[in-house]
C-alpha cells in the first residue's frame, strides 16, 4: 500500500547498506534506491544490490553514470585559497593537484576556455576567473575564500566541453548493470538525443530493457529537452550542477517547464538535489525545504530524490519519513484546477491514452475509488500516472521488472502476479486483495483498463461495482487466487 502517491528515490552508499537499514527506508516510504558509480567499489555494489533484493522485489534500483563530467585530480590534503590568489589550471588527469597548480581530468580543458571565463569547483564553493592563457595552462584568480578537497566537480558556465557522452568506466558500469538486472540508468549531463542513444545502443546490443533517465544538468540539456524526451524513458531535474551551469534564479522556472514537458510526454520526472539538505546534520528540515518539496508536488513531479541526506547523513530514515509526510499532505492540498492539462497528442488514434484519460476523468464524475490495469510493459500505467488522478492506480504486472519500472510513476502501486491465464484473472485477484486490505468496500466502483491478453495494447475500459464484478467472477468459475491476497 502506498504511503503517498509521489515516489521517493534515496541515494545509498555501500558503506551503509545493510538489510535492516534498507528495510527501514523502504517502510518509511522509499521506492527506488540510487547507486552513485562515482563513490562506490564493485564489491560495494554487489552487497548493496543483494541487500536491496533481500528486502523487497518491489524496490527499484537506479544506477548513476558519470557522463561527460570534469573533476579535479587527487590532492594529498585539503588546499586553502584566499580571495585574490593566483593559481594555474592544467588538463592532465595523471597529475596530482597542488596549491600552485590544479589539475583536471579533461585533457583539452585549456583549449576549450578563454580569458574572462569563469570556473566553478566543488559545486561553486571555489570560484576562479581566467586572467591569462598559454598553450599549456590557464592562469586564474581566486574570487572567494575556500578550501579545495580531492576529485571535486568542475563546471564552466556557458562553455561546451567537448567530451564524449560515455567514458570507458561508464561503459563498464552499464554492462555491469545489465548483468545485475538493474532497473534504471540515470545518465549524467545529457546534452542531446545522441547522448541517450549512445546508451540505448549498448542496451539493445545486449537485449536489455533497462530504462534510461536523462539527467538535465546544463543549458544544452534544457535547450534540447524535446529531442531528449523522444528517446529517454524519463528525466531527472538535477538542480545541483544545473544551478551552477545556469543562473540559480532560473532554476524554479526551468524545473516547472521540465516537469510539464515530461507529463505531456507521459514519462516520469524526478526532482533532485538539496530537498532536505539540512537533515544531513539536523533532525528537522527548514521551512524553506518543506515548501520546496510541496511546490515540486504542486508542479506535478512524479518523484523526489534524496542524496546526501540518506547516503551519509545523520538522519536518513527520518529524512525519508519527513519527505513522505510532506508529500502526503501536499497531495491532499493541491488544487485539481491547477493540474497540467494533458492533450491526447498528435496521434489521435492512441487508444491507450484516450482510455486512460477517460478513466481518470471518471474518478471525478463517478464514485470510483481505484483504477486497476493489468500491465505487460507498464505503458498503460504510465499513461494513467500522467493524467494525475486523485485515486491510486493498481498495476498488476506480468513481470517483476515491469513492477519495478513503475516505481517512479506517480500514484501507481505496482504488484507482480505471475502465472495467471488472462487479464480478467488479474482483475479479480486485485479486487479481492483491495477488499481484504480494507481499501475498497463491496459497494465501491472501480475502473479497469486492459487488453485482455498479455503483450497487446489496452483496448477497453470497464467501470464496475466491486461486488457485481466478483459475482461475475464466481459465475464464470474463475479461480479464487488466494495466493495473491
Describe the role of every protein-language-model region.
Residues 1-485:
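Non-catalytic helical/linker scaffolds that mediate oligomerization, partner binding
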Amino acid at each position: 500500500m502506498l504511503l503517498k502517491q509521489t515516489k521517493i528515490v534515496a541515494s545509498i552508499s555501500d558503506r551503509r547498506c545493510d538489510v535492516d537499514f534498507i528495510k527501514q527506508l523502504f517502510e518509511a516510504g522509499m521506492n527506488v534506491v540510487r547507486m552513485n558509480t562515482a563513490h562506490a567499489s564493485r564489491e560495494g555494489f554487489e552487497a548493496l544490490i543483494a541487500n536491496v533484493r533481500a528486502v523487497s522485489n518491489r524496490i527499484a534500483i537506479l544506477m548513476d553514470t558519470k557522463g561527460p563530467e570534469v573533476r579535479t585530480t587527487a590532492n594529498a590534503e585539503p588546499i586553502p585559497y584566499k580571495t585574490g590568489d593566483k593559481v594555474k589550471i592544467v588538463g592532465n588527469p595523471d597529475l596530482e593537484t597542488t596549491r600552485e597548480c590544479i589539475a583536471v581530468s579533461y585533457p583539452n580543458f585549456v583549449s576549450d576556455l578563454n580569458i574572462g571565463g569563469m570556473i566553478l569547483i566543488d559545486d561553486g564553493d571555489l570560484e576562479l576567473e581566467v586572467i591569462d592563457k598559454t598553450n599549456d595552462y590557464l592562469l586564474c584568480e581566486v574570487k572567494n575564500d575556500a578550501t579545495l578537497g580531492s576529485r571535486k566537480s568542475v563546471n564552466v558556465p556557458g562553455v561546451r566541453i567537448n567530451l564524449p557522452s560515455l567514458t570507458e568506466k561508464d561503459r563498464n558500469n552499464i554492462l555491469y548493470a545489465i548483468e545485475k538486472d538493474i532497473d534504471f540508468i540515470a545518465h549524467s549531463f545529457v546534452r542531446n538525443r545522441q547522448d541517450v542513444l549512445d546508451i540505448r545502443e549498448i542496451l539493445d546490443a545486449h537485449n536489455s530493457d533497462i530504462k534510461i533517465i536523462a539527467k538535465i544538468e546544463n543549458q544544452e540539456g534544457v535547450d534540447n529537452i524535446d529531442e531528449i524526451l523522444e528517446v529517454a524513458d524519463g528525466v531527472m531535474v538535477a538542480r545541483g550542477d544545473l544551478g551552477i551551469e545556469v543562473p540559480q534564479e532560473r532554476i524554479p522556472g526551468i524545473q516547472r517547464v521540465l516537469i510539464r514537458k515530461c507529463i505531456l510526454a507521459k514519462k516520469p520526472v524526478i526532482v533532485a538535489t538539496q530537498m532536505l539538505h539540512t537533515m544531513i546534520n539536523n533532525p528537522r528540515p527548514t521551512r524553506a525545504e518543506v515548501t520546496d518539496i510541496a511546490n515540486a508536488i504542486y508542479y506535478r513531479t512524479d518523484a523526489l530524490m534524496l542524496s546526501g541526506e540518506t547516503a551519509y547523513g545523520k538522519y536518513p530514515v527520518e529524512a525519508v519519513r519527513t519527505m513522505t509526510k510532506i508529500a502526503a499532505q501536499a497531495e491532499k492540498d493541491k488544487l485539481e484546477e491547477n493540474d497540467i492539462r494533458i492533450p491526447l497528442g498528435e496521434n489521435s488514434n492512441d487508444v491507450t491514452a484516450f482510455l486512460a484519460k477517460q478513466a481518470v476523468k471518471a474518478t471525478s464524475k463517478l464514485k470510483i475509488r481505484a483504477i486497476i490495469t493489468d500491465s505487460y510493459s507498464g505503458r498503460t500505467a504510465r499513461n494513467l500516472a500522467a493524467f494525475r488522478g486523485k485515486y491510486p492506480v493498481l498495476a498488476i504486472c506480468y513481470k517483476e521488472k515491469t513492477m519495478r519500472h513503475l516505481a517512479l510513476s506517480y500514484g501507481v502501486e505496482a504488484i507482480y502476479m505471475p502465472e495467471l491465464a488472462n487479464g480478467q484473472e488479474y482483475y479479480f485477484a486485485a479486487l479481492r486483495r483491495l477488499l481484504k486490505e480494507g481499501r475498497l468496500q463491496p459497494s465501491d466502483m472501480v475502473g479497469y483498463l486492459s487488453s485482455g491478453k498479455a503483450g497487446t495494447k489496452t483496448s477497453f475500459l470497464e467501470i464496475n461495482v466491486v461486488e457485481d464484478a466478483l459475482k461475475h467472477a464466481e459465475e464464470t468459475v474463475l479461480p479464487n487466487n488466494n495466493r495473491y491476497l
